[in-house]
């Protein structure tokens, strides 16, 4: 028998607005003994049905909603319906970009909490971060096999956040053969190498596709500095845009080696590219000391804040790194700067960048705002799905 969760009076407002999370403090009582990932029904204080959800006894988010339809059964057909809808929603962007790599499912933003799925050519990569996603792993794999017959399915749930759900980090093949070599995907006319097994996250940052395309417009006859370059895909767009030279900077030699191969995959001019293994903060200060200047700088750092306690320090980090970047830009140069920290709201990020300009002694013009690509949608009921913020700035 399905366990039932009953809420405190007045704690049902977010669920009535179809937000997918239920926090432990909102719960009054539980009928039954639900285990890790078990399906439960959620009811208001008067017993009225609100949602069907996955129970997570170890997390502050005690339940994540699967459905607000009382009649909907959480089985393989449920996951197949949700995933087919997610694929259909992305059909236009996939066709327009000639994409063989894209995010198929963006977890809560596609109404499947904890379920992230990326498609890289003929391999589907799953990251299952919630107790419910783990519990229904078999049904999720079955749904993917029905939609994408013949494709391999690989799991990259090797992240510490799973421990908050009482789950162990894990990775490995779920169906088909484990990839023995990097996969090549197509993006806006480029061939891009993706390391599914050992790359960051699921292997590649698909969410920055539109931002990479934006760089192409600010590259003609420019010297470009690509900070935190990872596998160098921003530099591909800079090269196609006609840059004089682009410098990729990252602390990972394997990532830089992949960046070099990406230039070769696309028959671009290696003589116009440098690959620098260095800490970005240290190198920027060295450039400032040596008087090295660039026309265009891409500043795409990793997440600086995983929780609210880290937000103040993250603001300092973003301000410091953007300040130095502005100091090594030529007058009228272009800065493309980003934050992937969901806790860093758009207005706060803009203020941090503006403060960096003041500290740098520069005048700042914000020309455009950027965010995550269209295969990373934001559900109207889940504003937390908006996490990637970008600004294109002119600096004088």
From Swiss-Prot:
EC number: 2.1.1.191
GO molecular function: RNA binding; rRNA (cytosine) methyltransferase activity
Function recorded in the entry: Specifically methylates the cytosine at position 1962 (m5C1962) of 23S rRNA.
Catalytic class of the enzyme: transferase
Keyword terms: Cytoplasm, Methyltransferase, RNA-binding, rRNA processing, S-adenosyl-L-methionine, Transferase
Gene: rlmI
Name assigned to this protein: Ribosomal RNA large subunit methyltransferase I
PROSITE patterns: PUA
InterPro entries on file: PUA (IPR002478), PUA-like_sf (IPR015947), PUA_sf (IPR036974), RLMI (IPR023542), RlmI-like_PUA (IPR041532), SAM-dep_methyl-trfase (IPR019614), SAM-dependent_MTases_sf (IPR029063)
Classification via HAMAP family: 23SrRNA_methyltr_I (MF_01857)
Record field: catalytic activity: cytidine(1962) in 23S rRNA + S-adenosyl-L-methionine = 5-methylcytidine(1962) in 23S rRNA + S-adenosyl-L-homocysteine + H(+)
Record-annotated PUA domain positions: 2-79
Family recorded in the similarity comment: Belongs to the methyltransferase superfamily. RlmI family.
UniProt-listed CDD domains: AdoMet_MTases, PUA_RlmI, RlmI_M_like
Taxonomy of the source species: Bacteria, Pseudomonadati, Pseudomonadota, Gammaproteobacteria, Alteromonadales
Compartments where located: Cytoplasm
GO cellular component: cytoplasm
């Amino acid at each position: 028998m399905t366990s039932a969760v009953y809420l405190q009076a007045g704690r049902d407002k977010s669920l009535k607005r179809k937000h997918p999370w239920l926090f432990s403090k909102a719960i009054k009582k539980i009928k039954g003994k639900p285990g890790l990932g078990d399906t439960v029904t959620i009811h208001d204080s008067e017993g009225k049905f609100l949602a069907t959800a996955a129970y997570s006894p170890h997390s502050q988010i005690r339940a994540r909603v699967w459905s607000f339809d009382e009649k909907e059964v959480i089985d393989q057909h449920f996951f197949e319906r949700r995933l087919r809808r997610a694929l259909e929603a992305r059909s236009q962007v996939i066709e327009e970009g000639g994409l063989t790599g894209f995010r198929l499912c963006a977890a809560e933003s596609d109404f499947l909490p904890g379920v992230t799925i990326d498609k890289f050519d003929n391999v589907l990569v799953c990251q299952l971060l919630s107790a419910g996603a783990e519990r229904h792993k078999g049904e999720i794999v079955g749904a993917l096999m029905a939609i994408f017959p013949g494709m391999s399915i690989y799991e990259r749930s090797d992240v510490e956040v799973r421990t908050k759900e009482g789950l162990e980090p894990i990775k490995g093949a779920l169906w088909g053969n484990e990839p023995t070599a990097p996969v090549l995907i197509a993006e806006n006319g480029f061939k891009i190498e993706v390391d599914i097994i050992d790359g960051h996250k699921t292997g590649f940052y698909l969410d920055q596709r539109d931002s990479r395309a934006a760089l192409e417009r600010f590259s003609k006859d420019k010297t470009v500095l690509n900070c935190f370059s990872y596998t160098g895909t921003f530099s591909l767009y800079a090269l196609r845009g006609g840059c004089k030279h682009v410098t990729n900077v990252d602390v990972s030699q394997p990532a830089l080696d992949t960046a070099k191969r990406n230039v070769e995959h696309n028959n671009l001019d290696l003589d116009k590219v440098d690959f620098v293994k260095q800490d970005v903060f240290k190198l920027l200060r060295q450039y400032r000391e040596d008087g090295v200047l660039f026309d265009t700088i891409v500043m795409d750092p990793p997440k600086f804040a995983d929780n609210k306690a880290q937000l103040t320090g993250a603001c300092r980090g973003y301000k410091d790194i953007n300040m130095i970047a502005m100091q090594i830009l030529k007058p009228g140069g272009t800065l493309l700067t980003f934050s992937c920290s969901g806790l860093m709201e758009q207005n706060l990020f803009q203020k941090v960048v503006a403060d960096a300009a003041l500290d740098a002694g520069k005048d700042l013009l914000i020309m455009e705002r950027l965010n995550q690509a269209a295969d990373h949608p934001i559900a109207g009921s889940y504003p937390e799905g908006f996490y990637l913020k970008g600004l294109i700035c002119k600096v004088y």
